Regions:
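Hydrophobic alpha-helical targeting segments used for export or membrane insertion
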Residues: 1, 16-19, 59, 188
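Catalytic glycan-binding domains that act on GlcNAc-containing polysaccharides
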Residues: 29-197
Length: 197
């Protein structure tokens, strides 16, 4: 009965996204029982609009990188929507950065040591991240914590530098027109998916 009650909490867009990946709300509920710390426990309490964003971003992730496992895509999308709102940044920005940085691969590691979906440099930011509940460098490979780290940094850079282009240059580690163009193109694509005319 508890599983059926939880099913009703999910917006139809979430149910449709799950179905498109061969899953159901019951599969999600069973997964949540095994993962008590997941941000997806909050999914049923997200507004209908935010649940629709999670569904749209999940489909975007799977569409751009089908090798991302269905639950990883849903966790990543849930984290992108949740932490973008928490840190006051547009979800299409955080999603575009994750796509550009790693193609949504939570195990990605750059040759410079950037890790996870958002390609965060643990050795540079560990103090800030630990102060915000991201305890170890292995947390960078958890899609939800990796997204939390990236959104936190993007928010700080936007606040410090006053614009998205300057924040992206800082996030990237230097000025790069090519990087900004990639992120900007992806932002436009994601924005049109999330906010169709």
């Amino acid at each position: 009965m508890a599983i059926e009650a939880r099913d009703a909490e999910y917006h139809q867009s979430i149910k449709d996204a799950l179905r498109s990946m061969g899953l159901s709300p019951k599969d999600l509920t069973a997964w949540l029982l095994r993962h008590p710390e997941s941000i997806l426990h909050k999914l049923g309490s997200f507004s209908a609009d935010d649940q629709r964003k999670v569904a749209t971003v999940t489909r975007y992730i799977r569409g751009t990188n089908p090798s991302v496992a269905p639950m990883t895509a849903l966790r990543t999308a849930g984290a992108l929507v949740y932490y973008s709102a928490k840190y006051g940044i547009p979800v299409h920005l955080s999603t575009a950065v994750a796509h550009t940085e790693s193609r949504f691969d939570p195990k990605a590691v750059s040759n410079k040591g950037a890790m996870g979906i958002m390609q965060v440099m643990w050795r540079v930011h560990n103090g800030l991240l630990q102060a915000n509940g991201i305890a170890t460098k292995d947390d960078m490979f958890n899609p939800e914590k990796g997204v939390a780290a990236g959104c936190l940094l993007l928010s700080r850079y936007i606040n410090a530098y006053g614009s998205i282009p300057k924040a992206l240059a800082r996030y990237y580690g230097g000025s790069s027109t090519a990087y900004f163009r990639k992120v900007n193109t992806k932002m436009a694509n994601i924005r049109s998916s999330i906010y169709p005319q």
